[in-house]
Amino acid sequence: MADLSVDMCGIKSPNPFWLASAPPTNGGEQIMRAFDAGWGGAVWKTLGNPIVNVSSRFGGLDYGGRKIIGFNNIELITDRPLETNLKEMYEVKKRYPKHAVIASLMVETKEEWKEIIQRAEDAGADGLELNFGCPHGMCERGMGSSVGQEPKVLQEITSWVKAYAKTPVLV
């Protein structure tokens, strides 16, 4: 069988097939089932504060105001406590040390970035994804895609993260 292993920025995994940060990566049990099924890595559903649960989780896309042609997912960051996610992340890395686990992060202040980075790395995250692209969560608080659209803010937060992180940082 062919060797499909990858090394991306020092993050190793048995193959290039990874789950994105989304509802299927919202917990350790789901990620372990994915690894059992052959996935090589996972980006944990975005961790941060506060936990906000929205309803409904879908918004309709209409065509000319006449008919629905699709749906938007308006789910925000994880709706599970940070401590629970970090404990499960630790267990996933313990059970699957050769699989990639990336912590997707979204917080506001420099102090919050420093704390969540250390906690994610202590839980075994192989790398950090800075969630600067999410179009439907926390924009009103200067997070998600509002950061990704402002180069100076993006540069400032990325510099904080790089100063604190010991693992690769993905922006």
Protein language model annotation of sequence segments:
Residues 3-13, 18-23, 27-171:
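Active-site entrance/lid segments in N-terminal catalytic domains of soluble metabolic enzymes
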